[in-house]
C-alpha cells in the first residue's frame, strides 16, 4: 500500500515507518521537525530496507497535504503528527488545539477532497479520563481528560466518529495507546526528547548516562503495592506492529474501529526503575517528590479486542523495554545528531 505517515520522523512514527517499509509498503513521511530531527531519516531507510519519501511541512497546510495525496496516489494515512506533552498543553492550550484538532481537520479535509478514506489515528488512553474500574475496556464511555492534550485527542476522536457517520464509506481506526517505551533493538533508533523528558523511561535513561542527576518519583503513598503510580508500558516495536496490522486488516473496511494497544498489565514506577537498573548494571539515583495534580494511582489496558480482531498482542517484556532503551541511550547519549 502507499501510506502517508504524518509525524513520521517522531518517536512512534519512525519505528512504525521502519515496520511499514519492511512489510513492503511505500511510505511518504510528512513532518515539520518540531519534535524530531532530520538525521533519523537515513536510519529509517537503513533499518526499513527501502527508501521513504520525506516532505518537510505542517499538518495544517491543507494544500500541501492534498498535493501529497494526489502526487503519490496515497491509499491510507497513519496520523501521528501533533503536540504531546501533557504539562506543556496546560500552559499552551491554544497551540495544542491548533496543532492537534485544527491540524486533523485540515488533514481529513484534504483526504476527503482526494477521495482517500482509510485513516489510522494515534489516540491515547487519556480519553478515558478517570474510570472507576480497571483494566480499561474500549466499551467504557470516554471520560473528561485532565489536560488540553487529552481533550484534544478526545475532540479528534469525536470529529472522526462524526465524519464516518456522515460518510459511512470511511474506515477509521482509533488506536488508544497507553505508555510507549523502548527502542529499536538495533540501538540506532529510539526516543530523543527535545529538552527535559516528560516521560519516565527516557528520563531514567538520561539519569543512567549522566545527563540528569536524579529521577523525581512523584508520589509514594498511592494505594498500590509499592506506593508508586502504576501504568501499562508497551514496547514501541509492539506498538508499531499494531499500527501496521490495523492498517492492513482494516483497509476499506468501513466503520470506526477502536482498539486499546497496551500490554494488559500494570507496572509501578519502581518496577520500571528496577528493570532499568538491571539493564544498565548500576543503580538509578531517584528521590520521592509530592504527587502531581491529576495523576491517577493506577490504570492499564484490556487489549483483548485487538488480540481477538486483529490477532495482535504484545510480545516484549518490561525487561526488554529497559534493555532496548539502554542499548539506544548508551550508544547515543546525546540522542540523534542535529
Curated annotation (Swiss-Prot):
Domain of life from the UniProt record: Bacteria
Disulfide bonds: none
GO cellular component annotations of the record: cytosol
EC number: 5.1.3.2
Active-site residues, Swiss-Prot/TrEMBL: 149
A GO biological-process term: galactose metabolic process
Stored NCBIfam families: galE, PRK10675.1
Family per record: Belongs to the NAD(P)-dependent epimerase/dehydratase family.
Self-association state and partner proteins as the record states: Homodimer.
Protein's recorded name: UDP-glucose 4-epimerase
Species of provenance: Salmonella typhi
Amino acid at each position: 500500500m502507499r501510506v502517508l505517515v504524518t509525524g513520521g520522523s517522531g518517536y512512534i512514527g519512525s519505528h512504525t515507518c521502519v515496520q511499514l517499509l519492511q512489510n513492503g509498503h511505500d511510505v511518504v513521511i510528512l513532518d515539520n521537525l518540531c519534535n524530531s530531527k532530520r538525521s533519523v531519516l537515513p536510519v529509517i531507510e537503513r533499518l526499513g530496507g527501502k527508501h521513504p519519501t520525506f516532505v518537510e511541512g505542517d499538518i495544517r497546510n491543507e494544500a500541501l497535504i492534498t498535493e501529497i495525496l494526489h502526487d503519490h496516489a496515497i491509499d491510507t494515512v497513519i496520523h501521528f503528527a501533533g503536540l504531546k506533552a501533557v504539562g506543556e498543553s496546560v500552559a499552551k492550550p491554544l497551540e495544542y488545539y491548533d496543532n492537534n484538532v485544527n491540524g486533523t481537520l485540515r488533514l481529513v479535509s484534504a483526504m476527503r477532497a482526494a477521495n482517500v478514506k482509510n485513516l489510522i489515528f494515534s489516540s491515547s488512553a487519556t480519553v478515558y479520563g478517570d474510570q472507576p474500574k480497571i483494566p480499561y475496556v474500549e466499551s467504557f464511555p470516554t471520560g473528561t481528560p485532565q489536560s488540553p492534550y487529552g481533550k484534544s485527542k478526545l475532540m479528534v476522536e469525536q470529529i472522526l466518529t462524526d465524519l464516518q457517520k456522515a460518510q459511512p464509506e470511511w474506515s477509521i481506526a482509533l488506536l488508544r495507546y497507553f505508555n510507549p517505551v523502548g527502542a529499536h533493538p538495533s540501538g540506532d533508533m529510539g526516543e530523543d526528547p527535545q529538552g527535559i523528558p516528560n516521560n519516565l523511561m527516557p528520563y531514567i535513561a538520561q539519569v543512567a548516562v549522566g545527563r540528569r542527576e536524579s529521577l523525581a518519583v512523584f508520589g509514594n503513598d498511592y494505594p498500590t503495592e509499592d506506593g508508586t503510580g502504576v501504568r501499562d508500558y508497551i514496547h514501541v516495536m509492539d506498538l508499531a506492529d499494531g499500527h501496521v496490522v490495523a492498517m492492513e486488516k482494516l483497509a476499506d473496511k468501513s466503520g470506526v474501529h477502536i482498539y486499546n494497544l497496551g500490554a494488559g498489565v500494570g507496572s509501578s514506577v519502581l518496577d520500571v526503575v528496577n528493570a532499568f537498573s538491571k539493564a544498565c548494571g548500576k543503580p538509578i539515583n531517584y528521590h520521592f517528590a509530592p504527587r502531581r495534580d491529576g495523576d491517577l494511582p493506577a490504570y492499564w489496558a484490556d487489549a483483548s479486542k485487538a488480540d481477538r480482531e486483529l490477532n495482535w498482542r504484545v510480545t516484549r517484556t518490561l525487561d526488554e523495554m529497559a534493555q532496548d532503551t539502554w542499548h539506544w541511550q548508551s550508544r547515543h547519549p546525546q540522542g540523534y545528531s542535529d
